[in-house]
Every structure is written in C-alpha cells, then in structure tokens.
Design a protein with these regions (language model features):
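Short hydrophobic beta-strand element within catalytic cores of glycosyltransferases
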Residues: 282-285, 295
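A conserved, positively charged/aromatic
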Residues: 102, 106-136
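Short His-centered aromatic/hydrophobic patch
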Residues: 84-90
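A charged, aromatic-enriched C-terminal amphipathic alpha-helix characteristic of glycosyltransferases
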Residues: 316, 330-364
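A conserved mid-protein helix/loop that constitutes part of the nucleotide-sugar donor-binding site
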Residues: 17-25, 184, 188-207
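Nucleotide-activated donor-binding/catalytic signature segment of Leloir-type glycosyltransferases, i.e.
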Residues: 55-59, 226-245
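Glycosyltransferase donor-sugar binding loop
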Residues: 36-44, 189, 212-226
Length: 367
C-alpha cells in the first residue's frame, strides 16, 4: 500500500486548510495510507474530524513542529509521496534526508505568486517533483523556483446548491443577531488577521455613512486590538457588531447587503467570497491574487483595482467605491438585480469543476 504524507502548517480553520482537507478527501477511494503532520497550534485541530470522516484511510494526524522530529519521522517512514505546504520543519529536513540517500518524491502546494511565499521553497526547489498552483502563476514559479512541472488546480470544490437569501430570511437573521431589520448592513465574514486588513472595511463603511457594520470570524489578537482602536475613533463604533468565531456563519452572511473584503493580498479566490455570492450577497474585493481573474466587475461583485503589492487598499479607492455603490444599495430593485447576478455567478463557479480529479491526475505518477 502506498503511503502519502501531507505536511501542513496548521489544522485550524482557514483557506489553506480547506485545500488540505479537499486534497486528502480526493484520495479517499484509492488504496493508499494517508498521514497528516503539522507544525503550529497543536491545540487547534479544527479540521481533524472532517479529515478522518472524508478519508477513512487517514492513519495518523501528528504534531511534528521541528526539523529533527520531521527528519526522524520521515527517515523512518519513508513515504512514497510528500505533499508539502508551509511546514518549515519538513522543508529544513528534506536536504538532510537527501544527503543521506533518502530522496522522497515531493509535491508542493503553492497558494500565492508573491515572492515572500515562493521564496520559502527556494532551498528545496531541486528536490520538488511537482508544483501544485492554485491559479496560473507558472511564469513566476519558473523564474524563482526552476523547471519542475506545474499543475494548475483551482480550489473550487463541490458545494450543496445554495439558494438566494430572500428578504424575509434576511430580516430574521438580522433580528437574531441584534441588527436593524431594515437599512444597509455591510461587513466581512471569515478569518480576521493583518493580511485581511479589516480597517479597510471600516473606512469603506464610514464613506457609505448611513450603514451598519458586521464582522464575524476568529480575530487574531493583534488585529483585534488594532480594530478596537480603529472603531473607538470611528462614527460607526456604536453601529458595529463583532460576533467573533461562530460554529455556523450562515446567519452572518444572510444578514449582509454587501460583503466587503479589503485584503492586502490573497490566493486564488477566497472561499468566503463564494459563500457570500452563492447566497446572493454581492461582494466588493480587491484585484489581488487570482480574484481579478475570476470576478468581473458588475457581474455579481465589484472590484477595487488595487496594485498587487501586499499593501493596504488605498483610501481613495475605498471612498470612490463607496460613492459608486451608495446609490445602488439605496435602490432596492436595482440591488435585487445585483443579488441575482451574485447568486448565479457564485453557484456556477464550482458546479462544473473537478478539482479532486485534477489533483489525482497531478499525483498519478506516485499513486
């Protein structure tokens, strides 16, 4: 039986962890043994139950944070394939293993085209057999990491057919959350950290003026503190609701008129955007990562034409977007058309794409 090892940064909820989960699930029907090792947050194994449920061949899920532990374990187990994503201990162990004649076939999942992301793998680029890119940044990989083959696998996974949230359900969701049943509600739902730059969401909402603001999702401590200070100085301070992490985010999405993302940088196309769109919630998002290659302005969402430079969305762009969207949000009939476009685009996005088959095809030489 072939042994496939997935080495990942962490197992708490996040976009990269969703990709890991779907990669593991893609091998469920094959006669292979699967191990998962990770390096950070040993007490946050959020996705472990679903990993085991989606693939009964998961034999072990191990916290192996350091180089020596990863080296010893890999040397002992000698897997048939290593699928790696941002596990520093494993990355440091691989050259030492190779020097001792233990050459492990390796595929690396790349979520972003940024130098900071690709540069992590420069030290092992000659030991990588395949790069797994979430969107087409092959040229950057060739330039910075060398000639190993690239497979383009978008993280678009089958989802239950969602329906557009009707007005009455939106009112019920707002009442349940303590928001006004009428009026404009904009916000962000998902992991809240420095990269997501929630201060940009606040600035956009301030420029809209007559609105309520909603945040839902786990807040990274430093970002939460910065958001506290930002809201304390904002006229929206008393009209902002922060729900923190929730077991089910459906109510938060349902309450929104507009989903606002102001990330400094992103990967292919964040799952949260899909979750908003498929419910009929139009999105406002920056042209970073793969977002601008997928979302067309006015067809379910609106784009902030931001340079892909890992910096905050410029204030002028946020203010201009608010000026553009304010009259659209105020026109219920017109906004209903944008809701319908969002729903149609969001549900079609994942319907006919088989990421699992593409993943198995990319790994087929070792399966």
């Amino acid at each position: 039986v072939k042994h496939i090892v997935f080495a990942h940064r962490k197992l708490s909820f996040g976009g990269g962890e969703r990709v890991l989960l779907e990669q593991v699930a893609a091998l469920a029907a094959l006669p292979v043994k699967v191990s998962v090792i990770f390096r950070k947050e040993p007490g946050k194994r959020d996705i472990e139950p679903e990993l085991r449920q989606r693939n009964p061949n998961v034999a072990e899920v191990l916290h192996l944070p350091g180089t020596f532990g990863a080296f010893s374990w890999l040397r002992r187990t000698r897997p048939d394939l290593l699928v790696l994503c941002n596990h520093k201990g494993v990355q440091r162990a691989l050259p030492w293993l190779a020097r001792l004649g233990c050459r492990i076939p390796t595929a690396v999942t790349l979520h972003e085209h940024y130098e900071r992301h690709l540069g992590k793998y420069r030290g092992i680029r000659n030991q990588v057999d395949r790069w797994l890119c979430t969107y087409d940044f092959t040229a950057a990989v060739r330039d910075r990491l060398g000639p190993a083959p690239c497979a383009i696998i978008h993280p678009l996974y089958p989802r239950p057919e969602a329906r557009i949230v009707p007005a009455e359900e939106r009112r019920i969701a707002r009442r349940h959350l303590g928001l006004p049943e009428t009026g404009t509600v904009v916000g962000y739902v998902g992991q809240i950290d420095g990269r997501k730059d929630p201060a940009g969401v606040v600035r956009f909402a301030e420029a809209l003026e007559d609105t309520h603001l909603l945040f839902a999702g786990r807040e990274e401590p430093d970002t939460a503190q910065a958001l506290d200070l930002r809201l304390a100085a904002s006229p929206l301070g008393e009209r902002t609701l922060r729900l923190g992490p929730l077991p089910e985010l459906g109510l938060a999405f349902a309450a929104l008129d507009l989903y606002v993302m102001t990330s400094r940088n992103e990967g292919f196309f964040p799952l949260a955007l899909i979750e908003a769109l498929e419910r009929g919630v139009p999105v406002l998002a920056p042209t970073v990562g793969g977002i601008g290659t997928v979302l067309k302005d006015g067809e379910g969402g609106f784009l902030l034409a931001k340079a892909d430079d890992r910096r905050s969305v410029p204030e002028a762009l946020l203010v201009a977007a608010a000026a553009r969207l304010k009259p659209l949000l105020a026109d219920e009939a017109l906004w209903a058309i944008h809701r319908a476009k969002a729903h149609a685009f969001g549900t079609a996005l994942t319907r006919d794409y088989d990421a699992a088959a593409k993943f198995r095809e990319a790994l087929s030489p070792w399966l």
